[in-house]
Structure formats: C-alpha cells, structure tokens
Amino acid sequence: MSNICVASSKLNLPTLLRSVFRSEFTAELRPQQEPKSLFLTRPTLFTYRRVRDGRHFSSLTRSLEFQSRSPVSSHSSLLVATDVCSTPQPSESVKLSNDQVSVSHATDSTGAISTRQSANNKKGSGTRATPDLMATESDSSKTSRSQGPRVSALSSLAKSNKKRETWQIQKDALKKKFKEGWNPPKKLSPDALDGIRHLHSVAPDRFTASVLAEQFQVSPEAIRRILKSKWRPSAEEMEERRERWDRRHDRIWSQMTELGLRPKSRRANQYSDAKVLYDDSGKQE
C-alpha cells in the first residue's frame, strides 16, 4: 500500500488553483498584448493609447510581472513538497540528535574525570617526591619561632640595662603617686600655705598630709611638697603676692554679686562688668 504524503496533499490544492486562475487570466490578456508590437512600429499611436488608457497599461505591466514570477513560485512550491515527502519523520531525527548529545556528554564527563585523576596523581607524586623539602621548611619555621622570643628578650634586657634619664625617673614617680591621673594643682593663697605649715608644726601627728589634703582639697603629694620646701619669700615678694591675691578676691566677689550669691561691696564694684561697660555718669564708653 502506497504511503500518502500529507505535506504534498496540502500543497497540491493551492498550486492547482493558481494554475487554473493563471490560465484564465492569460487567456483574457492575450489580445491586449498588441501595444507591445505597436511600440516599435507606431510610436504616435502608442503615446495616444498611453494617455487615454494609462491605468490599463499599468495593470498590463503588473500582470506581465506576475506571470513571469508565478512559474518560479510554483516550481519552488513543488520542490518543497517533494523535499518534505522525501525527508524522514521529525521524531526520528530528534531521537538521533538526542542520542548524539547524550554520547557527547558522556565522552565529556569521562574526559573531565580522567583529567582530574591525572591532576590528583601528579599532585600526589609531587608531594611524595619532595618530603625532604617539607622537612627543611618545617625545621626553618621552628628555628625562626625559637629565635624570635630570644631576640625580643635580649632587646628588652638591653633597654632595661640602659641608663635612664632623670626626667623619665621623675615621670614614673609621678605616675605612681598620682594613679588617678595628673591634675593641675590647686592655687593656694599665701595665708593658706602659712596655715598648713603652722598646723603641721604644732601637731604633726594630728595634722598629717592626708588630713590636710582633705581639708584644703588638694592632693597629699602637694601637701608633702609644701611641707618639704624650705623656700620662704622675702618681705617685698610677700607684699606683692598679698596684693595680687586681694585683687583676685575682689574680682571673684564681683562675679558672685552679679550672680546674686554675694552682697555688693565698694571694693568689688570696680571689677564688675557694668563698671567696665559704663562710666560713672551711666553713658556707654
């Protein structure tokens, strides 16, 4: 039993219809092909007909072009139909292509596995072939580690044996005495200094450095230095120092009066901000 090609059966119907319509169309156009010969013999008549029947001439040229192209298209359609009939089924081709792809993947995977195995073998052979190098490297690292602490210990000993400067010794002593940090010393008046010395000379067991430090709100080290010092100012220096402290007292008193914490006084009035900004008449300077 003969096999029927589905593609050829689908393509035969339009080709037959095209051939039928083409034959009818060419039969109608055959008597109208005379102007083509008149173009060479009678140019005046051709120009007259072209002006009169311009649309008819354009349709004629289009029909001629269609007629020249149609045999080529019909021939190509017939060739396509024959090719479709002669080719195998698509399912078989897909199966073959899938089989080829699977075979190629299998070969690629086996090749990759073989390359990995060869690389591992090379690595293993390299590591086995060079145990001496590994041993030497480990020995060198051990020696460097053992020598490191020795070098640091020697450097620390050299630094400790080196003679220290006086300012370094004093700095370390101050750090030990002032563990909470170095704070600026509190300014004590000459009367306070004299009072500290007098109290300590009268009752040294009762007025110790720690007690005096709590009383005058300074560090015990500052009290020890005050008691230890043997320097005494002269009469002129004492008078100058006393005047300076009196001015400081009046200035602080004027600031307290502006805040409302102290009563007004004539001595502190000259240090007030109002006295600095305005004169006695109340005008701004």
Swiss-Prot record:
It is found in: Mitochondrion. It holds the Pfam family Neugrin. Keywords: Mitochondrion, Transit peptide. InterPro entries: NGRN/Rrg9 (IPR010487). Residues 89-165 are annotated as: Disordered. Transmembrane segments: none annotated. Its main location: mitochondrion. One of its GO terms (cellular component) is nucleus. Residues 89-128, 137-149 have a biased composition (Polar residues). PANTHER family: NEUGRIN. Belongs to the RRG9 family. Required for respiratory activity and maintenance and expression of the mitochondrial genome. This is Required for respiratory growth protein 9, mitochondrial. It comes from Aspergillus clavatus (strain ATCC 1007 / CBS 513.65 / DSM 816 / NCTC 3887 / NRRL 1 / QM 1276 / 107).
